[in-house]
From Swiss-Prot:
The lineage of its organism: Bacteria, Pseudomonadati, Pseudomonadota, Gammaproteobacteria, Alteromonadales. The gene is purM. Transmembrane segments: none annotated. This is Phosphoribosylformylglycinamidine cyclo-ligase. GO terms for molecular function: ATP binding; phosphoribosylamine-glycine ligase activity; phosphoribosylformylglycinamidine cyclo-ligase activity. GO terms for cellular component: cytosol.
Amino acid sequence: MSTPTPLSYKDAGVDIDAGNALVSNIKAAVKRTRRPEVMGNLGGFGALCEIPTKYKQPVLVSGTDGVGTKLRLAIDYKKHDTVGIDLVAMCVNDLIVQGAEPLFFLDYYATGKLDVETATSVVNGIGEGCFQSGCALIGGETAEMPGMYEGEDYDLAGFCVGVVEKADIIDGSKVAAGDALIALASSGPHSNGYSLVRKVLEVSQADPQQDLNGKPLIEHLLEPTKIYVKSLLKLIEASDIHAMAHITGGGFWENIPRVLPDNCKAVIQGDSWQWPAVFSWLMENGNIAQYEMYRTFNCGVGMIVALPADKVDAALALLAAEGEQAWLIGAIAHREGNEEQVEIL
């Protein structure tokens, strides 16, 4: 009788050595994001982080998100170095709207066969996003799962925890008629609406490499999500912010009402900004109705801030000094009965 061939985990499609190589490759990216509150080093069973001592009544704020089908485009066009920024942005931008300073971030990277070079590029991007937001990358999970993903496909998820002083939580309760609305420009579609983006590319049979305003269309589509944390933390400290809305999935119609009292509505001046070219291209080539555009995409507006009207000039000056493109986009008005909570004029 012949002796059965001994099997290893690698024979089953899981390469532990590749995982170890990845950990070695990302150490510099992780170290760059370290905050003084972080305890211990990468590789422990659990990651430890103290709450900053400046907080008297700290409230932890958490969020989790992914990059959605933007990953499909990134994988197809081998653009792996910025999807990590997208991942962090989608989480930390959700935290900042409640006034929370991001503390730490963890990522989950899942694939059928671990490509160390690709994974290193992705995690380095996560490190860059954490650096941009002042958030420590303190841990994560790399799951190599043969038979679960096809070819070079992978998926990402992120989890972030931030902290805010209990008395300083921004929850929209101070919003009142007469408040002004300031918009902060997006860098592109960010990480929302990409199933529709891909459908437009399919139906129009457009060449993703075609020129659009001086650079390939695909570069517009894969532009990383803008991170607003540092500029908005400064604005929160300097001004009286009543509410903030991160314009993500659901666009204007779904996200702005999340931070408004029932008796208030947002009146948006649709002519106060010009849509970036990529949104006009999507609308034209997909024959998408304007209502659907505002429901699916940010249309050039990544964040909306509600604040007293007499604080607008100072806020715009501060944001400009921080490198943000911002403008007065509308105002809060009294809402009657079952009126829609968002009007775009």
